[in-house]
Amino acid sequence: MTDNNPTRCGYVAIVGRPNVGKSTLLNHILGQKLAITSRKPQTTRHNMLGIKTEGDVQAIYVDTPGMHKANDKALNRYMNRNASAALKDVDVVIFVVDRTKWTDEDQLVLERVQYVTGPLIIAVNKTDRMEEKAELIPHLQWLQEQLPNAEVMPISAQQGHNLDALEAQIAKHLPENDHFFPEDQITDRSSRFLAAELVREKIMRQLGAELPYQITVEIEEFKQQGHVLHIHALILVERDGQKKIIIGDKGERIKRIGSEARKDMEVLFDSKVMLNLWVKVKGGWSDDERALRSLGYGDL
């Protein structure tokens, strides 16, 4: 700490509807892949911390599941509760919206963030895709009218446009505090959790429209032996048909899933990785609160 630059540290919640670019934003800010992404809604299921320390400032980002209307299964209720809980006890809230459309789920998030009493920034994403920037002005003005106390900033999470300005604005709002985490720590999540998420990401990207949402991944073994990290991952589905989809014809799809996940793991863990995948049917797990707790989904 210097006289001109007090040490600042605080929590920053990133909220918004599903598939609006929250995890992409976090990854770009951190400068590395931490949160999984795909084009499918509800990719993020858990709140996860992404920690960025730069000089005197430590910003602790809370990446959240997309707030959505579906509340019929225990898993949906868990994700919505996690996202709403992130609005409490944070120092700054980033409400991510897509400049191309406004949905009922955006409105749902707006109705929740309007009660935020601390600093609120509306990050209008995907503005790099606009040919005429003047077309954006009415949308920015409308957002400002909806949340008069918020700061509205156009960004591109994918391209990194205006993220330096966003981070500077966040830093201004963080309280003067000693840093809560070591300078080199980037998340609160375990390596096993990150490995499971990478496998789930590759499943979501491989399956596309065939994707059964009732999929989760459990790491059964995570062991470093010499220069090789051995990881055994169990993919849980709810029906036999889902198992067949993931395995694919002659096992080709699950081989691709494993190959792509392994490559990302080797970068993340800086080690050669031996990855083994299995698929198991566990009927009804996504609506079974006891099963969800045993799979690490916390309080329901």
Curated annotation (Swiss-Prot):
Region (G5): 155-157
GO biological process, alphabetically ordered: ribosomal small subunit assembly
Era-type G domain location: 8-176
Region G2: start-end pairs: 42-46
InterPro entries, per database record: G_ERA_dom, GTP-bd, GTPase_Era-like, KH_dom-like_a/b, KH_dom_type_2, KH_sf_prok-type, P-loop_NTPase, Small_GTP-bd
One Pfam family it belongs to: MMR_HSR1
Subcellular localization, as worded in the UniProt entry: Cytoplasm; Cell inner membrane
Bilayer topology: Peripheral membrane protein
Quaternary structure annotation from Swiss-Prot or TrEMBL: Monomer.
Similarity comment text for this entry: Belongs to the TRAFAC class TrmE-Era-EngA-EngB-Septin-like GTPase superfamily. Era GTPase family.
Name of the protein described by the UniProt record: GTPase Era
Lineage: Bacteria, Pseudomonadati, Pseudomonadota, Gammaproteobacteria, Pseudomonadales
Underlying gene: era
